[in-house]
Swiss-Prot record:
Pfam families: EMP24_GP25L. Belongs to the EMP24/GP25L family. A motif (COPII vesicle coat-binding) lies at residues 205-206. Involved in vesicular protein trafficking. Mainly functions in the early secretory pathway. Thought to act as cargo receptor at the lumenal side for incorporation of secretory cargo molecules into transport vesicles and to be involved in vesicle coat formation at the cytoplasmic side. The lineage of its organism: Eukaryota, Viridiplantae, Streptophyta, Embryophyta, Tracheophyta. Probably oligomerizes with other members of the EMP24/GP25L family. Associates with the COPI vesicle coat (coatomer). Associates with the COPII vesicle coat (coatomer). The keyword Iron does not apply. Its main location: endoplasmic reticulum. This is Transmembrane emp24 domain-containing protein p24delta7. Residues 162-175 form a coiled coil. PROSITE patterns: GOLD. Residues 23-179 are lumenal. It is a single-pass type I membrane protein. A motif (COPI vesicle coat-binding) lies at residues 205-212.
Length: 212
């Protein structure tokens, strides 16, 4: 029970606290890098990516192109772009699991280093609250209530997700314990059989030697 409460508290803190949603990394030409994100079913996800221009006063060179592929845990492609400098994707996850975004830089000689800026948001983080406030011009209190409502919905969905994961782990533990019990029984039976065979062999040996 205490462990469950701790998990819920950590979940609430992770949702309410600020998170870093943008990453920037280097990618060598001819190489591929993949980033995975655990997303649960029915969650909205949005991604934006772009190649940083090393020379702002000039257009990106032809070597600065990437192929992007976003796939589900079962391998379903949600986004594919070939030879692009930037792009974006959005979808609602159908299944729960690790979704993978892979970036492949075009092969180029001499080898070039690309800097990729990637922003991947999931769940309530797909909401851009600053734009919502500017576009609707709502009162401060109404805006805060709406934001809190969305946060509560996110917590609600995450709690159901954790409950399902906990149930899966519980069923897995039961199945594992059953297999271990069966394996222990088989091991005991094998040991007793071997001991019986050894006893019979020794008895036969001593009888032949007329020691018993």
């Amino acid at each position: 029970m205490n462990h469950r409460r701790s998990s819920i508290v950590l979940l609430i803190l992770s949702i309410l606290s600020p998170v870093t949603l943008s990453i920037r990394y280097e990618l060598l030409s001819g190489h591929t890098k993949c980033i995975s994100e655990e997303i649960h079913a029915n969650a909205m996800t949005i991604g934006k990516y772009s190649i940083i221009n090393p020379h702002e006063d000039h257009p990106l060179p032809s070597s600065h192109k990437v192929t992007v592929r976003v796939t589900s845990p079962q391998g379903t492609a949600y986004h594919e772009s070939d030879g692009v400098e930037s792009g974006q994707f959005s979808f609602v996850a159908v299944e729960t699991g690790d979704y993978i975004s892979c970036f492949s830089a075009v092969d180029h000689k001499p080898e070039t280093t690309l800097i990729i800026d990637f922003d991947w948001r999931t769940g309530i983080h797909t909401k851009d609250w600053s734009n919502v406030a500017k576009k609707s011009q709502v009162e401060t209190m109404e805006f805060e209530v709406k934001k809190l409502f969305e946060t509560v919905n996110g917590i609600h969905d995450e709690m159901f997700y954790l409950r399902d994961r906990e149930e899966e782990m519980h069923n897995l533990n039961i199945a594992t314990n059953s297999k271990m019990a069966w394996l222990s029984f088989v091991s005991l039976a094998v040991c007793l059989s071997v001991a019986g065979l050894q006893f019979w062999h020794l008895k036969t040996f001593f009888q032949k030697k007329k020691l018993i």
